[in-house]
């Protein structure tokens, strides 16, 4: 009963609170909490020390099968600070069978073939429109598009020139003039070389010829882009057909043997 009597009289224990500016850090740490944290820290430091010693004294010819799950030796060195310690092993992804992959390539081939047929129809319509617009005498290759100029590198870089000014006002006036010239140049390029000053001097026939030439140039650019798209789709279709043929169960043409000879399959005589 004496212990119960003392327990009733004992004051309730309260944790010491942090000062107002340190309330975000939680309650104050006691000595027992510090001992646990220090013991855990020293234990981890001892483990790291032993691991460093093992790494320094390791055998270069050592091998165990856990190494097979790594990309290469020293992942921490190749990946740098982003290395988390995990190795690239089995992620649970199941490898698809050859038959399944071949079926998927068949679906891809069907999609590419459909898009190639659509692109071929579009190209045919554009070529017919180009001929009807009067481009039978002018081949499409005569018109140089912007893409051709970029690929050929015909646009040379402008030489840089350093200009010195006496004052800030003179420099500001020169910058405003340069900006106005660039805006005027962009406006002229948008008009595609169409000069409004010569419009009054031109006759109706010349105006019609000029409009016809602009339409032909526009159609020629579209025809070139359609041909480029059709060629890319045809190349993709050929590559998919070749991959599908190489994945067949029997030997097909397009592959090579281990000795380097090309596989040639002859059809059975009928």
Swiss-Prot record:
Subcellular location: Nucleus, Nucleolus
Region described as Disordered: 1-24, 137-211, 249-270
Keywords: Nucleus, Ribonucleoprotein, Ribosome biogenesis, rRNA processing
Cross-referenced InterPro entries: SSU_processome_Utp11
Domain of life of the native organism: Eukaryota
GO cellular component, one term: nucleolus
GO biological process: rRNA processing
Subunit composition and interactions: Component of the ribosomal small subunit (SSU) processome composed of at least 40 protein subunits and snoRNA U3. Interacts with snoRNA U3.
Membership in a protein family: Belongs to the UTP11 family.
PANTHER family linked: U3 SMALL NUCLEOLAR RNA-ASSOCIATED PROTEIN 11, U3 SMALL NUCLEOLAR RNA-ASSOCIATED PROTEIN 11-RELATED
Name the UniProt record assigns to this protein: U3 small nucleolar RNA-associated protein 11
The gene coding this protein: UTP11
